[in-house]
Amino acid sequence: LTTGSLAVNGNDEFKDGFGDLLPGCTAVPSDDIMALEYELSKKDVAAFIFETVQGKGVYSPSREYFAQAQELCKKYGTLMIADEIQSGMGRTGRWFAFEHFGLSPDIVTIAKALSGGFVPVGAICYRESIYNKVFSKMDRCVVHSNTFGRNTLAMTAGIAAMSVLEDEKLVENAESRGLELYE
């Protein structure tokens, strides 16, 4: 955990005891489109970060909420970030849970299942326009380097896990098994 990730976490129990976190982070209630629009209309919100399937409680906001949220993000120039740490990599019958809602986020965070649970590994995917703003020049290309990045074992585990997901059609299997559970 980082103070940045804690600052955008909606669970106050996780934040207790960590002191000052990033200022200006506001949580809005799930499925409350009016609360979201109120915050975004201030035009000082960099990003709307959401879990399609919330890790705590396995709750999913409505399809209408997500469609309206995406439109509001476009309207107010706010980035839409899908936190797929727990629900991504085929766990819901699609590569990413946001696909069930027809969403097209600007940024996607992935971890946990990315290595099949073998080693810690995470990734971030983003639009080319975001990449160009962050890493547009040679002096910016290593602006966010890290000590443990590009770990060979983690990357190998990630590639192997993705190969198994594809070769054994586990995403499709998760979808069909999920439909059986609904019946």
Residue ranges and their predicted role:
Residues L1-E183:
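Conserved N-terminal phosphate-binding loop of PLP-dependent enzymes in the Aspartate aminotransferase
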